[in-house]
Amino acid sequence: GGHAGALSPFALLRETREWYDGTILLSGSISDGHSVASAIAMGADLAYIGTRFIATEESEADDGYKKMLVESAAKDIVYTNYFSGVHGNYLSPSVEKAGMDPLALPEADKTKMNFNSGGNASAKVWKDIYGSGQGINDTNHAPTVSTHIAQTNVEFQPARFDFSVKSNKHSEKILP
């Protein structure tokens, strides 16, 4: 989780569809059935859930990482390139635990990227500094993978129907 970019998934999907007609798998704040339905409504063929699966029973992520995901919210995310030279979203509590101020991280030297060790700090990215996507608010417990998938499907079906009803209702107001 926590792979980041400066372009909204809305803009990215629209721009990509202008030149690419193949299968598009959209990610970014997708954590439940409602967001999967939204991604498909926007024109994606598939949706990718990242962070939410880190905090599952089967995940091999550190238990401290899982606990921090469950206890955190989007307000706890810091966007920085300090740890690897590449911008990413990280959990502020993990940055603080490593002895740093998440609001005072310097910019990394982009000529000295180090993807293996976290490069620009003694704390190691993905080992000590935890990544997290912005859809973290739905990560409020650590279920099994099968439970999360079942819940996502339960949410997806009515969300897809609701979108259809709402789009028909609003199209009457938009279209002549």
Language model feature labels by segment:
Residues G1-A6, A55:
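Short, small-residue-enriched loops and turns at beta-alpha junctions
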Residues P9-L25, S31-P176:
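Conserved active-site-proximal phosphate/metal-binding subdomains
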